[in-house]
């Protein structure tokens, strides 16, 4: 029987997701263009639990922004962190909501189901399934909106690689060859 990983509100603006899919991971080294550790999370539109918890945390961050950054009101040009994957042309995004989560201060800790650290970058790839701890925050620099900080990741399961990931050599050459019936002594 498969386990169900429930999303949870940890504080008003911090959550633990349910099972989500990883895309564009830059988790072991900072992404050169942004100078941050980051990834995109794909949340199945049927996962009402994760989406509900996430929306509560986003609303709390909006209220925080209204009170602390946006002069008592939510701006008309507010940018939210969730985007509709059906509007994207990226592989695997259909039927999902997606968001970008970043951390410029520290590398997220990445663990497996036994809560042991994952140190091999190839174990955590675009297409695998994870759950993540995230923190939402309001911002008013370069526009107004709610951003998402990536805290930590737990890998839950392997999945089909996204983005045309290459196959392994072992998979490409999984046959043992056939005996051609000839003598293998090439020096005769």
Please give the residue ranges for each predicted region.
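Serine/threonine-rich low-complexity intrinsically disordered regions
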Residues: 23-24, 44, 112, 120, ...
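A broad, structure-centric signal for solvent-exposed, well-ordered loop/edge residues
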Residues: 50, 106-108, 157-163
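Residues in well-ordered beta-strands of folded domains
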Residues: 40-42, 100-102, 154-156
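Compact mixed alphabeta submodule
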Residues: 116-188
């Amino acid at each position: 029987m498969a386990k169900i990983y429930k999303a949870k509100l940890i504080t008003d603006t911090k959550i633990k997701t349910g099972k989500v899919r990883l895309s564009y991971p830059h988790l072991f080294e900072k992404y050169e263009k942004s100078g941050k550790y980051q990834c995109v999370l794909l949340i199945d539109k049927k996962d009402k639990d994760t989406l509900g918890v996430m929306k509560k945390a986003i609303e709390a961050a909006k209220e925080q922004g209204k009170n602390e950054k946006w002069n008592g009101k939510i701006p008309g040009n507010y940018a939210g962190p969730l985007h509709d994957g059906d509007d994207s042309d990226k592989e695997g995004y259909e039927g999902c909501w997606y968001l970008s989560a970043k951390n410029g201060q520290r590398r997220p800790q990445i663990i497996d189901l036994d809560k042991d650290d994952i140190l091999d970058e190839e174990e955590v790839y675009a297409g695998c399934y994870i759950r993540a701890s995230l923190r939402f925050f309001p911002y008013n620099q370069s526009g107004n909106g709610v951003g998402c900080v990536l805290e930590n990741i737990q890998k839950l399961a392997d999945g089909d690689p996204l983005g045309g990931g290459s196959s392994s050599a072992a998979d490409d050459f999984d046959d043992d060859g056939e005996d051609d019936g000839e003598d293998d002594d090439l020096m005769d």
